[in-house]
Amino acid sequence: MTDDKKKILIDYNAHTINAMRNVVKEVLKSIQNNTLPENHHFYITFDTNFKNVDIPSSLKNKHPEEMTIVIENSFWDLIIKDSFFSITLSFSNIKSKLIIPYNSLLVFSDPYANFHLKFPKLEYNKEIITRIDKNKENIINIKDFKKDK
């Protein structure tokens, strides 16, 4: 007898997505000295509304939902951390620092290598707000229990 409704206890999808994000992190580490291998260049699309994304307001106004950056010849101060990377790029001849969490990534592409990764758009911000709103119903103010003295 086979059970058609198996309970899968290992979230392979989440592990795969984490591995894909780790590929991006390792690739960026490999160019941290501001040197890309010949002909390689990266397109990175990210969710500009994602928690801890930090970009100048002028860029946020131009890209209210998503933004694609190109890492090619001119980039500075690439710093790789466990949960994000930061990079300085030039936009209209103005250098701007961007902080991009790996969880905000939507696309990573190296057209020269014909390598492309597409990530699901995470809805953490909406989930947290919904959870907080639901929990507000269960919050009791301590002032309601204090006796006046």
Language-model-detected regions and their locations in the chain:
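N-terminal, Lys/Arg- and Ser/Thr-rich interaction peptides
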Residues: 1-7, 18
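Short hydrophobic short-linear motifs embedded
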Residues: 8, 119, 125-146
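N-terminal recruitment modules of adaptor/scaffold proteins
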Residues: 13-99
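Short acidic, Gly/Pro-enriched loop/turn segments at secondary-structure junctions
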Residues: 111-123
